[in-house]
Structure formats: structure tokens, C-alpha cells
Swiss-Prot record:
InterPro entries: VIT (IPR013694), VWF_A (IPR002035), vWFA_dom_sf (IPR036465)
Name the UniProt record assigns to this protein: von Willebrand factor A domain-containing protein 5A
Role, per record: May play a role in tumorigenesis as a tumor suppressor. Altered expression of this protein and disruption of the molecular pathway it is involved in may contribute directly to or modify tumorigenesis.
Species the sequence originates in: Mus musculus (Mouse)
Gene that produces this protein: Vwa5a
SMART domains cross-referenced by the UniProt entry: VIT, VWA
Length: 793
């Protein structure tokens, strides 16, 4: 019997979205983006087309327009409920209508509706947005164009109003009916060193001799198998800067959009200092949902996410300081924790945790992060040990606002370091839980190693806090400052600080300057950064700084319709409508009243498909929440436009041509399962990881059979070569392990740097003056030449 898979129409209609075109303008560390979606209705009936797509959470969307038969229709930003009502009314009257909105449950998911698209009609829908570009640890500015929207697990009590509930069709990459092209123009007064990408780019074209302007494009034939990531390297990215922007002339001079705005960017040179060795409670909250059984990337031999997570937890455990407290949680539809409450870090507790880490599996179903978070926050605080929370998730959570609100409510008692794993992780969730708690957010995509990025954040967590942060302004008489950004509580070494402010009063008519100084105290030492700026800015019709400032204000107040109070909602609405920046309470709507063709019966509804990546696990998760939707379906889903198959994979929306291949894969799944597993690196395959797993909690190594195998030397030869037999035998084996690491694990040094420090500190306490002699003997035995300076001698 033939099985029909997915959504199949009787006459095999084509999808109305034909092309997505993105123009990107990057000036210093701000990106201005223009995205155009080109639609064409090749059917014989009017259509309503819906396209659900991801966008970075920091994006400030400020313009939405449609071009129909040469006529531009500019959308108006309205209260979301009013916009929905007008959209429905326009369609009922035969007008053409367009609606753009954020999802009710996540700020990084948007839906675009094109209603009453007539047969043969072509429409270009354009949206514009601006965003800050995050800074990577190597100094690169990172722009991400999300192409992947992962399925989001459904909370059982969630409303059906979310656009995440729409059954978004999926098709194989080769059958994707629309294309993407992107061109990026980059300018920086400091000069552009290079541009890198995870996708194929055209050769970089420098537009000026001094390399302050450049252009790159995606090559033709780009597949939607990954997010599009650009890494931009400037020659002097660490230079502080201040940009001033004049307000809109038609707005009140003292209003948000009428007064001049300033954007301050500091990159303080904070020296690295050693934190207290016994300070902190470290709780690691690890995603163990089914999606963690996916590969880290599409590259061959890529680790599964859960295997990378296990190695990451091992490295974190080995790098913790003696005397601290820790616990590990795993979460999915339910959650598990290693210990009833956080325990003191000792050899026994560390060994117990390592055994449990090695046995972890991605077997806890969906992604319900809120319940374990509440459990962590309810636990009693440990005096003298501030809570440091590390959250690892692929971001497949639908109701992000509830999670963000819970983290914010507990922000005074902890810092949260968040990690978005894989392409499609929710930027709204990952960025905001870090932002509201004073932590850092990290995204792990492509060839990134989870282990490297996690250890980098642990270094931040172990650093002493920067206290008494303050800003002082030096401005001409008659000019004052109103801060728009929330108070910054913490600055980490290597972290950039962006501040928005409003300049009130009279701007000077002649050339003049202002200055701003960032002051802070680190371990009793006063530090400061000062920068001077011009008060005669160039005109900017996009009002980029004003809109970014408005977005910053919205982010501090907007926690969605389910979480916001009446006062918060009104405040967000006022900021959104005044600035023209989209929020969760507003929506863009445009109506073409010149089209006045009454609709006969319901509009046929077409949901634009998204791609299925090779090796993606997204297919197997649709069925896991397909029956969990409560309440009435959205209006657009009540239109009987498709015949759904009755197969168990009914929520997989694939073209019929792809179904036979999937059926073959099902038939051979049992025989190929073991082979599939072999394609991915298993936990502990790396010899460096094997060596690290043998380290004791105090930082030392003991000489045993496992260590001798890694060193590649017989036990009797090792014992005979020990030049300090009167010392603790562990001193000799610890020196051998550290020497071996420096010779064989240099490419992963950032991952074992903390545990090496612990080993060296232990050696100084237990071997002292014998260290130089031990290092020389270790080099001789292992035939290496590691510099004794790495041991601090």
C-alpha cells in the first residue's frame, strides 16, 4: 500500500514565495538590514500566504512595506489586537492586506502574512531592521542571518495563538522552492582586516584604498542548510567610541525620538586576576531533550550534541576550584539532578559526578526548562558562595518569556551563563537570561566546540567582579544626559559595554566636543576609560541609534502578553509606537484598498515551507508535540486547504518525491543505526579528554595503568626515571601529565588551561624546589622539550 507523506494538494500547487533578498550594511558594530520577500501566485485562486521565520532577538524592526504592481504600500505600526482586527476586516472586504508580527511567546520568531494574493499577482514585501553586532572572544564582530527555525517544544498549557503552532511545511533542500541572496557592505574607520563566513562567499572587494570599506556576497546556489554567519575583523576593534545622532525634526524636542541620542561603546582593558580559590556555587543545567542527539554540525565525524555536552561537563568539573560547591541538572520533559542539593567539591563528589556524566543520554523528551530553574532558585543560598548558573540548551523552547521573567526575578542572587547549541537556537532565550542576570551569552554553531566556549565562560565566572561601575559625562553648559540603558552591574574581562543615552537641552551651534568616562574598581584598584566625541553629528535618516535605544528599552520591559502587567504593557506600547520599533504588543499592517475584489469563499492558505537539513533531527521531533496543542486553531489553520496523511509522520511536510527515500530509510533504520553512530565522535575518543578524566579534584594525577597507556611508556620505566623519589609520587606523575598536555594538546589549551593551573598550584604546594628537576626528567623520559616556565619556575 502506498503511503502519502506530508501536506499534498490535489493539483500540486506551487509555493508562492519565490526569493528572499537581503542587503546588509555594517557600519562599525551596527548592522542595518533590508530584507525583501518576493511572492507570486501561480494558482488560479486567491491565496493567503504565511511565512514563519527566525530573526536575531536584538533586531529592531522599524519598517514594513509592500510593492504591488509598482505601487508602494507602507505599513503602519499599531496595537497588535487592532492590527489583527483590521487585517481580518480588510480581507473580508476584498482588499489586499499584509501583517508582520512577533510571536506571542518568543521575540526571535516572526510571521509575515500576505492576504488576498490574486492569481498571477507579484508582490515584494520588504522589512527593515537594525541591530548591534556581538563581539566574539577573538575580536570578530558576528552577524547571523538565521535560516533555520527549529521546532519548539510545546508547554502543555500554552495558548494556540503562537505562530509556532502553525504547521510549517518542510522539504528537502534540493526541492526548496525559494532562494536566498545576500550582499553585505562593511565600513569602519579603523580598517577591515578580513571577512569570514560559514557559507561560500564571493572574494572580498575593497571599495577604498585604505580598506575602510568592503563588500562581499553569498555565492549563487546557496542552500538553506545552515544559518548564514559573517565574522568581520577590524584592525582596531578595541577602540572605545561614542556616536551622536540628531532627533527627528517633527517630534517634540524632549521626546525619545526628538532629542539627540548617543551610543557609547567601551571595551575596557580589564587585567586577568586569580579569583578566590574556594568561592562560588556552580550549577550546570544541561539540556537532555531528544534534540541533543543531533550532530553539532553537518560536517562528517561531527560529535553528537550530547557527547560534546558530556565532555564539556567533564572539563568543567575538573576545572572547578577546591572548596566550592556544585550540582548538575539534566532537563527535558522532566528533570534529574545528581545530588539533592549542591555539594562541596571534593575527590569523592567529583568522582561520583564524573561517573554520572559518562552515563548521560539525550532521553528526557521535550524541553521544559522552567521547572528545574524554579527548583534551583528555591534552594537555600550557601553563605560566601554566590550562585553561578550555566545553562546549556539548543533553545527549542516555545514560551521564552516565562523563563526570562523567572531568571530576572532571581537576578540579585545569581549570574546566568547561557549557551545556545546548534543552528536554530533561540536568540531570545539565550541572550535574555544572560542579560537580565549579568552573565554572558554564547552561541555554539558550525565547527565551534562547546567545550572551548564553556571553559571561556567559566573563566569569566571565576574572575573577581568589577564593582562600583559609574559613568561621568563632560558636556558644554546647557546640555545634560538622561540614561536610557539599564544600570550595568557587571563587566567581565573581554566584554564590551554598550550604553544608550539621551542628550537634553540645547545642542551647541558651533563645533564642540563632549567626553564620557567609565570608572570601575577591581580588587581595590580604580580603573577608567575615557573617550571624546563630536557634538556635530552627520545626518542619519535611518535614526539607527534612536531605534537601537528604543529596542534596548523595550527589551528591559517587554516580557510578553502572558507575563507583563498593565503598566508594563502600556509603557512598551508607548515606546514601540513612538519609535516605530516592533514589540510583542504591536504589529505592522498594510492594506491595499485599490484592490476591491470580493473573496468568494475562504482564501486558500499556503504556509511557506522551511528546509530539512541533511542529518537534521528536526523531523523526529514534530510528532513528539503534535498532539499537545490546546485551544482553538489560529484562523489561518482552520482553512481546509490540504489533505493530511494518516501516517505516523503526518506532521512532516515533505514533497511526495521525497517520501520514497524516507520510507527506504525507515526500512533500513535498524540495520544502519549502529553504523550511523560510528560516524560521530564518541565521548572520550580524544586522548586529551582521557588524560583529563584521570585528574584528581585537587589537580594532581596518580600513576596508574590508564595514565601509562596515554603516556606511551611502561610503568617500571616511569618509576625508575623519577628523580625525586623522596617527594609525593603524585608530583612526578602530575609533572608528566602536564608536560604531555603541552606537547600533545596545544590546539585545545583553552579547554585545559584552568585545570592545568590547578595542577601547577598543587605542585608548588607539594613539590616546591623539586619542580625544575622533575620537568627536566619528564622531558627526557617522554623525549619532549616543554619549557619549565609553564610550571612557574
Amino acid at each position: 500500500m502506498e503511503h502519502h507523506c506530508g501536506l499534498i494538494t490535489s493539483n500540486k500547487e506551487t509555493v508562492p514565495l519565490k526569493n528572499i533578498s537581503v542587503t546588509l550594511s555594517i557600519n562599525e558594530f551596527v548592522a542595518a538590514v533590508v530584507a525583501t520577500l518576493n511572492y507570486e501566485n501561480e494558482e488560479k485562486v486567491p491565496l493567503e500566504a504565511t511565512f514563519v521565520f527566525p530573526m536575531d532577538e536584538d533586531s529592531a524592526v522599524y519598517s514594513f512595506e509592500a510593492l504591488v504592481d509598482g505601487k508602494k504600500i507602507v505599513a503602519e505600526l499599531q496595537d497588535k489586537m487592532k492590527a489583527h482586527s483590521e487585517y481580518e476586516e480588510a480581507l473580508s472586504q476584498g482588499h489586499q492586506a499584509y501583517l508582520l508580527e512577533e510571536d506571542d511567546y518568543s521575540r526571535d520568531v516572526f510571521s509575515c502574512n500576505v492576504g488576498n494574493l490574486q492569481p498571477g499577482a507579484k508582490v515584494a514585501v520588504t522589512l527593515r531592521y537594525v541591530q548591534e553586532l556581538p563581539l566574539e572572544t577573538d575580536g570578530a564582530l558576528r552577524y547571523l542571518l538565521p535560516a533555520i527555525l527549529n521546532p519548539r517544544y510545546q508547554l502543555s498549557e500554552q495558548s494556540a495563538n503562537s505562530c509556532l503552532n502553525i504547521q510549517k511545511p518542510t522539504v528537502p533542500l534540493e526541492d526548496l522552492p525559494y532562494t536566498l541572496n545576500m550582499t553585505a557592505t562593511i565600513t569602519s574607520q579603523h580598517g577591515i582586516e578580513r571577512v569570514q563566513s560559514n557559507c561560500s562567499l564571493s572574494p572580498i572587494q575593497y571599495l577604498t584604498d585604505d580598506k575602510t570599506s568592503a563588500q562581499v556576497s553569498l555565492t549563487e546556489g546557496h542552500k538553506f542548510d545552515r544559518d548564514v554567519e559573517l565574522l568581520i575583523y577590524y584592525n582596531e576593534v578595541h577602540s572605545p567610541s561614542v556616536a551622536v545622532e540628531m532627533g527627528m525634526l517633527d517630534m517634540k524636542p524632549d521626546s525619545l525620538m526628538g532629542a539627540p541620542s548617543a551610543m557609547v561603546s567601551f571595551y575596557p582593558d580589564i587585567p586577568e586576576v586569580e579569583a578566590s580559590k574556594a568561592c562560588g556555587e556552580f550549577v550546570f543545567l544541561m539540556d537532555r531533550s531528544g534534540s541533543m542527539d543531533s550532530p553539532m554540525s553537518t560536517e562528517n565525524n561531527s560529535q553528537l550534541r550530547i557527547e560534546a555536552a558530556k565532555e564539556t561537563l567533564l572539563l568543567l568539573l575538573k576545572s572547578l576550584p577546591m572548596g566550592c560547591y556544585f550540582n548538575i541538572y539534566g532537563f527535558g520533559s522532566s528533570y534529574e539532578k545528581f545530588f539533592p542539593e549542591s555539594v562541596k567539591y571534593t575527590q569523592d563528589t567529583m568522582e561520583d559526578a564524573v561517573k554520572r556524566v559518562k552515563a548521560l543520554k539525550a532521553n528526557l523528551g521535550g524541553t521544559e526548562i522552567l521547572t528545574p530553574l524554579c527548583n534551583i532558585y528555591k534552594a537555600s543560598s550557601i553563605p560566601g558562595h554566590p550562585l553561578q548558573l550555566f545553562v546549556f540548551t539548543d533553545g527549542e523552547v516555545s514560551d521564552t518569556f516565562s523563563v526570562i521573567r523567572e531568571v530576572k526575578l532571581n537576578s540579585k542572587k545569581h549570574r546566568c551563563f547561557s549557551f545556545g547549541i546548534g543552528q536554530g537556537a533561540s536568540t531570545s532565550l539565550i541572550k535574555n537570561i544572560a542579560r537580565v542576570s549579568g552573565g554572558t551569552a554564547v552561541f555554539i554553531t558550525g565547527k565551534d566546540r562547546m567545550q572551548t566556549k564553556a571553559l571561556g565562560s567559566l573563566k569569566f565566572a571565576l574572575q573577581c567582579a568589577v564593582d562600583n561601575i559609574s559613568l561621568s559625562w563632560d558636556l558644554p553648559p546647557g546640555l545634560s544626559v538622561k540614561m536610557l540603558s539599564p544600570e550595568q552591574l557587571t563587566i567581565f574581562r573581554g566584554q564590551r559595554l554598550i550604553i544608550y543615552a539621551q542628550l537634553t537641552g540645547l545642542m551647541p551651534q558651533v563645533e564642540s566636543t563632549g567626553a564620557v568616562c567609565l570608572k570601575h574598581i577591581l580588587q581595590g584598584r580604580s580603573l577608567e576609560n575615557r573617550v571624546t566625541f563630536s557634538l556635530q553629528p552627520k545626518a542619519n535618516d535611518n535614526f539607527t541609534i534612536h531605534r537601537l535605544a528604543a529596542k534596548s528599552l523595550i527589551q528591559t520591559k517587554d516580557f510578553g502578553s502572558q507575563e507583563a502587567s498593565k503598566e508594563e504593557k502600556e509603557d512598551v506600547m508607548n515606546i514601540s509606537l513612538q519609535s516605530g520599533v516592533l514589540s510583542s504588543f504591536t504589529a505592522f499592517i498594510a492594506i491595499n484598498k485599490e484592490l476591491n475584489k470580493p473573496v468568494q469563499g475562504p482564501l486558500a492558505h499556503r504556509v511557506i515551507p522551511r528546509p530539512v537539513m541533511a542529518g537534521s533531527s528536526s523531523m523526529r521531533f514534530y510528532s513528539s508535540f503534535s498532539g499537545g496543542f490546546k485551544g482553538p486553531q489560529p484562523r489561518s489553520l482552520r482553512v481546509p486547504a490540504y489533505d493530511l496523511c494518516s501516517a505516523e509522520s503526518a506532521n512532516l511536510v515533505l514533497k511526495k518525491s521525497a517520501c520514497s527515500a524516507i520510507q527506504k530509510k525507515k526500512t533500513n533504520s535498524s540495520t544502519n543505526k549502529s553504523n550511523l553512530k560510528k560516524e560521530h565522535k564518541a565521548f572520550g575518543e580524544n586522548a586529551v579528554v582521557q588524560l583529563i578524566s584521570l585528574q584528581k579534584a585537587n589537580g594532581s594525577w596518580e600513576l596508574d595503568e590508564d595514565l601509562t597507556k596515554i603516556l606511551g611508556t611502561k610503568s617500571k620505566d616511569i618509576k625508575a626515571a623519577n628523580p625525586a623519589k623522596h617527594e609525593d609520587p603524585s608530583a612526578w606523575s602530575t609533572v608528566l601529565a602536564v608536560v604531555w598536555l603541552h606537547a600533545n594538546g596545544t590546539d585545545l589549551k583553552c579547554e585545559w588551561e584552568l585545570l592545568e593551573r590547578k595542577a601547577v598550584a598543587w605542585l608548588h604546594d607539594h613539590a616546591g624546589s623539586s619542580i625544575p628537576m622533575l620537568v627536566q626528567a619528564a622531558n627526557s623520559l617522554l623525549k619532549l622539550s616543554v619549557n619549565p616556565a609553564v610550571f612557574g619556575v
